[in-house]
């Protein structure tokens, strides 16, 4: 994600970084692993990690403002059935994430608290939702596109 002359990236190798686009200078880094592009709003970045943590990170310093643990497994006790998360995107003053259980999850950008979980698909959702013209679009792993307002 590139915004205001800075690139923000997170990778499965375990690093989230902020880089100055023109010089390539590393401004900060965090020990976070993920595959989804961070969402940006004002002075904050929102990112979901491989271990199902939703975080709010300061754009300027990389300091974590808050962290919210999302469900990691279908059966948390036995650690069976891992749940994979994608997103977030900011839509209607809420963070929206999707997961491998076919769910859309709405969370507060203020503290990460989950306000709603919706069954959006009968199968996994492996791509982040996108927002265009006040509509949230989902493409599930079976190729079905759905639109949400």
Where does each model-flagged region fall?
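Histidine/lysine/aspartate-rich catalytic loop segments that bind and position anionic ligands
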Residues: 55-73
């Amino acid at each position: 994600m590139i915004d205001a002359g800075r690139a923000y990236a997170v990778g499965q190798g375990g690093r989230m970084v902020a880089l100055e686009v023109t010089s390539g200078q590393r401004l900060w880094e965090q020990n976070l692993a993920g595959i989804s592009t961070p969402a940006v709003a004002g002075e904050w970045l929102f990112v979901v990690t491989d271990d199902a943590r939703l975080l709010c990170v300061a754009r300027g310093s990389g300091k974590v403002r808050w962290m919210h643990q999302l469900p990691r497994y279908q059966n948390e006790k036995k650690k069976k059935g891992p749940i994979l998360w994608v997103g977030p995107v900011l839509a209607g003053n809420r963070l929206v994430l999707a997961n491998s259980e076919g769910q859309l999850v709405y969370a507060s950008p203020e503290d990460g608290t989950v306000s709603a979980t919706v069954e959006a698909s009968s199968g996994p959702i492996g791509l982040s939702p996108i927002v265009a013209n006040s509509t949230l679009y989902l493409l599930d792993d079976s190729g079905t596109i759905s639109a949400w307002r």
